[in-house]
């Protein structure tokens, strides 16, 4: 879910890692055209991948496609402080035990989406702290030319 920078990176990486189908859901806003462009680019550059774009407002289609999927990623601001009680998934019955749910949101550490995925028994439900940490590592390397002490940074700032 989403079509901004983080979402686009996740969608492209999913295609490069072997995803056969990618469903992009985004609000009919200024980023919707980005989603359509991303879909075309992925299909043109990565053989064997089908990318479909739908309006996030179509919850029936969203739930239908979630049921066909193995992974759900939220790369929108939904659930981010100060709206931590928000989730784009209203019907949590779509979460199954073998399902993977990830959220790019890192504040709060555990979004409503992740809490509900865990409560539903999803195999993996993880928040955005890892993404934040590794983006920081990449930026550190770009600006300093050195590797960031990632484990130390994680222990000091993100553990617990």
Identify what each model region corresponds to.
Residues 100, 104-160:
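Adenosine-phosphate binding glycine-rich loop
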Residues 17-47:
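NAD(P)-binding Rossmann-fold cofactor-contacting core
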Residues 15-21, 119-124:
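Conserved S-adenosyl-L-methionine
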Residues 49-125:
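Rossmann-like adenosine-cofactor binding region
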Residues 5, 29, 106:
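Short, glycine/serine-rich, charged loops/turns that create anion-binding
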Residues 32-36, 83-84, 135-138:
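Short, charged, surface-exposed secondary-structure boundary motifs
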Residues 1-15, 26:
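Glycine-rich adenosine-cofactor-binding loop
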